Amino acid sequence: MAMLESYLKKQVLVLTADGRSIIGTLRGIDQTINVVLEKCHERVYSDEGIEVIPLGVHLIKGDDVAVIGEVDDELDKKLNLKEIIAEPMKPIVH
């Protein structure tokens, strides 16, 4: 939990258990890893490049969080998302 608190007010990427990739500014987190992101968007991967879907403020339930990581803003801005070809992530299977 303390590690995640160091990400507050920073840009993070959240990978969800159903395979979604959501990027935004971490505004809140609780003991069950419920996550509040602001200014966020989802990146949908396909063989036609990455589609960016604006979400605004978004709450992700802790049960749905697979991974949270800090995003390097400078590197992220250099990416040409239309040129990145990738299959969508598959959901986590327990």
Swiss-Prot record:
Keywords: mRNA processing, mRNA splicing, Nucleus, Ribonucleoprotein, RNA-binding, Spliceosome. Component of the precatalytic spliceosome (spliceosome B complex). Component of the U4/U6-U5 tri-snRNP complex, a building block of the precatalytic spliceosome (spliceosome B complex). LSM2, LSM3, LSM4, LSM5, LSM6, LSM7 and LSM8 form a heptameric, ring-shaped subcomplex (the LSM2-8 complex) that is part of the U4/U6-U5 tri-snRNP complex and the precatalytic spliceosome. Residues 1-74 form the Sm domain. The keyword Ribonucleoprotein applies. GO terms for biological process: mRNA splicing, via spliceosome. It is found in: Nucleus. Belongs to the snRNP Sm proteins family. The gene is lsm8. SMART domains: Sm. One of its GO terms (molecular function) is RNA binding. Plays a role in pre-mRNA splicing as component of the U4/U6-U5 tri-snRNP complex that is involved in spliceosome assembly, and as component of the precatalytic spliceosome (spliceosome B complex). The heptameric LSM2-8 complex binds specifically to the 3'-terminal U-tract of U6 snRNA. InterPro entries: Lsm8, LSM_dom_sf, PTHR15588, Sm, Sm_dom_euk/arc. It comes from the Eukaryota. GO terms for cellular component: nucleolus; precatalytic spliceosome; U4/U6 x U5 tri-snRNP complex; U6 snRNP. PROSITE patterns: SM (PS52002). This is Probable U6 snRNA-associated Sm-like protein LSm8. It holds the Pfam family LSM. The keyword ATP-binding does not apply. CDD domains: LSm8.
